[in-house]
Every structure is written in structure tokens, then in C-alpha cells.
């Protein structure tokens, strides 16, 4: 697998551009962490690296690495246009959540259009105290516009951001909004998923023969019954690499919106913090190797924690049951998140970023 270039020593917070493997990438870094973003493809995060350990926490799909921006010139069926570019990493799903949908006449693929359109990127602040970058993606088939402001302070292992979703149409419209970070690499080996969720729900199975857990089950996190045996599976444990274990669950009833992948042997983890009133669900997909056939071919060792406005259901069902966010014409939604490395198992990240000192822009 072709790796991204190694980090260079950083004297402080900074943003810089990198040309790599035909891609134009944006690096945001400080003394503790490095983020690599791909603005031309949904502002995807390709790398989130702890510089002290050298560990990159984001999963790389070996079938689609280096990343590719466009679907293959081949027949398409069964979400193949998405899987042609599914490199792993971290992307946003808007406005239809996971499932393909007819969005008021606009055909949208798996995970929506904002994860595939080109975004603009501007460094609005860079100093010894902090670097601030603003990225904006505009829908082509839908009237949604998402603006993301990332802030990284000096000597902190955490990045914080605000997201502003604007409905550019005059119409009241529904939206299912999901963040999709996929974790992989050495940090998830022998790791556990730690979260404040009280409740676990297994989704209805569109292909019951592939579901390892009992579909449509609701119970206390982290246990869910296996479909074949009824034995309770601890869904907080990341499946061992190469094993056939795989499951999809969504979590809810969060007193505080937070979760982490924690590796006790390394004394290191990666945490997320979000507004639990805005994202009341978090989906988690965990796999030791994934399906042995298309689209993963047994090469996927990953675990995800995906804050979401909605449960894992087709978009038309979400709308019919009012499990979406509604936005008036010309109005917007705003939320904030934080993500970064932790050295305590139950460390909860500070959601609010402290204001940066006045600086000159670059």
C-alpha cells in the first residue's frame, strides 16, 4: 500500500498544501498531531496521526488506495459507484444518510453527494497559537451547502470544528446527517470501543443471511444476541484482525455525546465529542476482515463510531417516521465537534474551543 509522505517537524500550528499521487491535499498540523484532508473529494480526512507514537488512526481500504476521485467506467449496481471511491478515512454523509435515495427527484448515491463534491479551502488564521481553516462544499443535485471551520491550537492533540449547513432553496427540506470516521491500523488491535451510550439497537437486516446479530434488537450497551446462537456478543470489543466477526449497531441514549477507541496495551486512544442533542445516535460498524467477496474481499479490519442525526434506515423511512432534521428555506443548522488522541480510557474531550489570540492571516 502506497503510504502518505512522513510528517516533517513542525514548529507550531500550520496549514500547507501537498501534491501526492495525483491528489491535491491539505495538511493541518502542530507539534502533536497531523491531519491530511482531500478538499477535492468531500474534504475527506485521509490521515489523523499522533506524532509521538507515529500511529495514524484512520483505516485505509487497500482496494481503493491511493484514493481515487471517480467511479470506474464499468456497469454500476448495488452501490458500486460509492465503493469505487471508498478509500476509508473520515467523510460526511449528507443529505440522505447512508442509503441511496430519491431526494425529491434528485438521484443520490450511498452516503449522499457532499462526500463526493469538491470543496473550497482557505486558511483564515495561522500563528504560534493556532491554525484555522475553513472548508465549504456545495451540493450539485441538492441545495445544501456545508461549511466546516477546523481549529488546531498549539501543543494540543485535539482538533475542534464547527459545521454550518445551509439550505439554499426556498423550500423546507429534511436532512439525515452523519459523520463517518473509520478507524484502523495498530491502534485498534486489541482495542475496545468506550462510550457513554446506554442503549444499543441493531438495524433491520436488508440481507438477513449476512447479519451476525439478531436484527431489530434493542438492549443495554454493549451486549447484543448473535442471530445463530443467541449468545450475547460484547460489541465494545474490536474484532481481531482476520477474524470473521462483524456487526453493525447504533447507539443512543447518550448523557454526553462522546466515545473513544481505547487501546489499553498502548495506553492510548482516540476520542470523539459531539452535541448529543444534535446527534442523538452513533452508528458503529466493526469487522475483523469484512465480507470475503465484493466490495471488501476480506481485507477490512476496522471499527467506526459515527455520530448521526438519525438511525440506520432508508431515507424515505426516516422522513416518513420524522427521524430527520427539517430546515426551513434559507435557514441553517450548526453544530460543533472535537476529535483527538487521549491517554485516559474515559477522557472526555472539551467540546468548546478556546478563542485564539489575534494573529495575522496567511
Annotate the PLM regions.
Residues 2-160, 171-174, 178-362:
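Surface-exposed acidic/polar loop and edge beta-strand patches at domain peripheries
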Amino acid at each position: 500500500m502506497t503510504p502518505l509522505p512522513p510528517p516533517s517537524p513542525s514548529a507550531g500550528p500550520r496549514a500547507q498544501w501537498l501534491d501526492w499521487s495525483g491528489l491535491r491535499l491539505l495538511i493541518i498540523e502542530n507539534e502533536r498531531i497531523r491531519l491530511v484532508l482531500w478538499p477535492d473529494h468531500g474534504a475527506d480526512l485521509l490521515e489523523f496521526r499522533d506524532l509521538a507514537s507515529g500511529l495514524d488512526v484512520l483505516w485505509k481500504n487497500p482496494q481503493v488506495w491511493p484514493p481515487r476521485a471517480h467511479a470506474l467506467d464499468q456497469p454500476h449496481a448495488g452501490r458500486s459507484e460509492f465503493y469505487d471511491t471508498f478509500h476509508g478515512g473520515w467523510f460526511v454523509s449528507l443529505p440522505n444518510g447512508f442509503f441511496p435515495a430519491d431526494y425529491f427527484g434528485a438521484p443520490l448515491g450511498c452516503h449522499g453527494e457532499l462526500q463526493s463534491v469538491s470543496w473550497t479551502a482557505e486558511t483564515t488564521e495561522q500563528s504560534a497559537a493556532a491554525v484555522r481553516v475553513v472548508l465549504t462544499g456545495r451540493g450539485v443535485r441538492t441545495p445544501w451547502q456545508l461549511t466546516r471551520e477546523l481549529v488546531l491550537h498549539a501543543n494540543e492533540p485535539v482538533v475542534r470544528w464547527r459545521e454550518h449547513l445551509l439550505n439554499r432553496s426556498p423550500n423546507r427540506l429534511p436532512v439525515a446527517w452523519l459523520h463517518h470516521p473509520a478507524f484502523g491500523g495498530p491502534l485498534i488491535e486489541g482495542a475496545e470501543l468506550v462510550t457513554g451510550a446506554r442503549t444499543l439497537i441493531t438495524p433491520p437486516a436488508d440481507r438477513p443471511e449476512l447479519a451476525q446479530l439478531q436484527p431489530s434488537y434493542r438492549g443495554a450497551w454493549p451486549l447484543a444476541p448473535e442471530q445463530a446462537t443467541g449468545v450475547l456478543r460484547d460489541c465494545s470489543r474490536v474484532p481481531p484482525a482476520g477474524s470473521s466477526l462483524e456487526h453493525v449497531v447504533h447507539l443512543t441514549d447518550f448523557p454526553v455525546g462522546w466515545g473513544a477507541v481505547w487501546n489499553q496495551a498502548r495506553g492510548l486512544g482516540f476520542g470523539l465529542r459531539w452535541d448529543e442533542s444534535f446527534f442523538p445516535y452513533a452508528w458503529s460498524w466493526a469487522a475483523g476482515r469484512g465480507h470475503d467477496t465484493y466490495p471488501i474481499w476480506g481485507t477490512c479490519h476496522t471499527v467506526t463510531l459515527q455520530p448521526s442525526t438519525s438511525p440506520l434506515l432508508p431515507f424515505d423511512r426516516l422522513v416518513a417516521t420524522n427521524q430527520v432534521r427539517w430546515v426551513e428555506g434559507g435557514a441553517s443548522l450548526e453544530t460543533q465537534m472535537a476529535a483527538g488522541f487521549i491517554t485516559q480510557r474515559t477522557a472526555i474531550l472539551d467540546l468548546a474551543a478556546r478563542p485564539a489570540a489575534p494573529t495575522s492571516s496567511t
